[in-house]
């Protein structure tokens, strides 16, 4: 896991606007939020991470980490029971920040659904986990 963290996964979102998916009702393709790092400030910093928490990119990062764990940590191959818990909280954070019927919630939900479908090489999270661990 240290290898994953050394990659500084949040850095890939620095300077990247949150642009709604084309299929997001009423706002398809529009920029919903942006974060501009201050000049001469490192990114990611605490301010940026607070911004990231209120975007679907937070869930995307969690699922990238889960994918890393599934591929690299040999879960289910030892004598002890392994447990992988995935908590996708961005939907909750975004809902509280922007309201349950906001375009931000719609876009976050669509992205979370898409990202869950693509988790694992087989294309479906449940199939990937079932194939790997039974």
Stretches found by the model and what they are:
Residues 62-65, 69, 108, 112-119:
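Alpha-helical packing segments of well-folded alpha/beta enzyme cores
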Residues 82-87, 132:
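Structural recognition of the beta-strand scaffold that forms the well-ordered cores
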Residues 98-106:
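Short secondary-structure boundary/capping segments
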Residues 96-98, 117:
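Extended acidic, low-complexity intrinsically disordered regions
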Residues 53, 106-107:
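Short, contiguous strand/loop micro-motifs
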Residues 111-134:
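Metal-dependent active-site segment of extracytoplasmic phospho-/sulfohydrolases and closely related
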Residues 1-80, 89-96:
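His/Asp/Glu-rich, glycine-adjacent segments
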Residues 76, 102, 125-128:
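Helix N-terminus capping/helix-initiation residues
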